Amino acid sequence: MDQPWNANIHYDALLDAMVPLGTQCVLDVGCGDGLLAARLARRIPYVTAVDIDAPVLRRAQTRFANAPIRWLHADIMTAELPNAGFDAVVSNAALHHIEDTRTALSRLGGLVTPGGTLAVVTFVTPSLRNGLWHLTSWVACGMANRVKGKWEHSAPIKWPPPQTLHELRSHVRALLPGACIRRLLYGRVLVTWRAPV
């Protein structure tokens, strides 16, 4: 089967690249259809994929039944997971589903081992301050969907996101000292952070 494409899947490779070589244990938060978790499982021995949506998680489990992934149906905010238990925590297009972004970022950061990596691709609410970026992203995404053929994921859609780019930056600065925030094509934002040793 050909690799499906949409603007979310486009960033799976970027998130994979953010996970350092030698990583042993990774958590995929809001794994949805499981494509990122399956990609990571090709090179990382212990992958845990968590999603709150049971039907979506079942489809991911079925699709990647042979992948060495621990599938977990849970709310990331209340799931029983070890603090500082993962060398890397990744999330693609899921953070904006959690209304309290500040608490969610704190939770995700707390799951990363000292020296480990947090890498999140998320959406932000369009704003006048970033209007040109949002407009060009929307146009680029529409063109890419027509050229590449957009694969429709089965996960729920949440729009609009709960925060603007300015608000997200404020939360990240307060909770994840030294984190990097980058605007990406297709209207996404990348947050990367290395947990202090």
Swiss-Prot record:
EC number: 2.1.1.-
Domain of life assignment: Bacteria
Keyword Methyltransferase: yes
An example Gene Ontology CC term for this record: peptidoglycan-based cell wall
Family, similarity comment: Belongs to the methyltransferase superfamily.
The keyword Transferase appears for this protein: yes
Keyword terms of this UniProt record: Methyltransferase, Transferase
Organism annotation: Mycobacterium tuberculosis (strain ATCC 25618 / H37Rv)
GO term, biological process aspect, one: methylation
Pfam assignment, any one: Methyltransf_11
Protein name, UniProt field: Uncharacterized methyltransferase Rv0089
GO molecular function: methyltransferase activity; S-adenosylmethionine-dependent methyltransferase activity
EC class (word): transferase
